[in-house]
Amino acid sequence: MAKTRGVLLPCWKRVIPLLAAMVLTGPACTQNPPSAAAPPPAPAPSESLATSVPLPTSPTGTATPTSGTPAAATPASDPAAVLTGIPGMDFSALSPAARRELATVMSDEFCYCGCPHTLGACLKGHTNCKHAKRMARLAARMVADGGPATEVIVTLSKYYASFREPRAQLKVDPRMCQGDPKAPVTVAEFSDFECPFCGKARPILEGFAKKNAGQVRFCYLPFPLSMHANAIPAGQAALWARDQGKFWEMHDALFEHQENLKPESLPALAKSLGLDGAKLAAVLKTDQYKQELEGFRAQGRSAAITGTPSVFFNGRFYDLGYEAEMLAHSLEDELEWRTNNNAWSAD
């Protein structure tokens, strides 16, 4: 069973504990389990993040080594043989159980660099392949958190395939973005102010964006869920404050008072920010901003999201979990992919 240390899980996974224990990562608050719809090569950040390219054959997952290629890594029944003798890599700190799972991953999964070799064979046969080392470190993090090999392999295959899939078309509001508008990577988050998982992800995502301010522009897209009674009025308050020039101040206040977002409590929040609480109270009695909120939700549905938080790197769905190390890893991958015109650099 996979542990979930440091990873935020969806509301439906909380409702179904067995599934929760078997899932490594995912969005958080959602009404229904995710469907099989695929998430939407890297566009330049702009108010419209859209692109579409042909989907080449992926070297990962079900690829089969061609004749004459090196044999796959030693069977995972002998973890010591699989994991030792890899230049520059030491997995001795992993538990015996984690080493067994990692050995299976290295024996069964193929390196994403494009070669026809398993990860283990690539690490030992192509010592200059930086991609194999990055993939191995990512897999090691996952098994260290308790991820079984079968789930790690699926997660890795989906993650690397996502770079070659068409990107989601996301329109962001610059007033609801932080960071350099010209940053090479726009990280867009669909979020619900009443979602507890969004509240937990918030400091991680914002800290990541601030740490990488020169490379990341962080944008917020409201995605109020019907399961949260106060999500719509909270969204109205945020958009109203945006029009007063204080979106992020209201954004922070809403999350800091997440346990009490009833409409009658929101005018006091506005007043604490130096805004006119009476005007907000009047807005909340109308349908003002509801159509705009529905527009954001339509964007999310078009991007095949099923819950919050849901994050995209330049329109590429991110599903490695809300940990600083995982976010940094995906940022490095996105920068390489973008720099090399939607391809991995040659080893």
Model-identified regions with their sequence ranges:
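Immediate flanking context of iron-sulfur cluster ligation sites
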Residues: 96-112
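Bacterial N-terminal signal peptides that target proteins for export
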Residues: 3-16
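C-terminal cap of thioredoxin/glutaredoxin-like
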Residues: 33, 131, 186-191, 197-210, ...
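Local cysteine-cluster metal-coordination motifs and their immediate loop/turn environment
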Residues: 108-124, 193-197
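Thiol-based oxidoreductase modules, predominantly thioredoxin-like and allied folds used
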Residues: 214-232, 257, 287-290
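Bacterial N-terminal signal peptides
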Residues: 16-26
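Bacterial signal peptide processing site
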Residues: 28-32
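A short beta-strand-turn-helix
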Residues: 170-185, 210
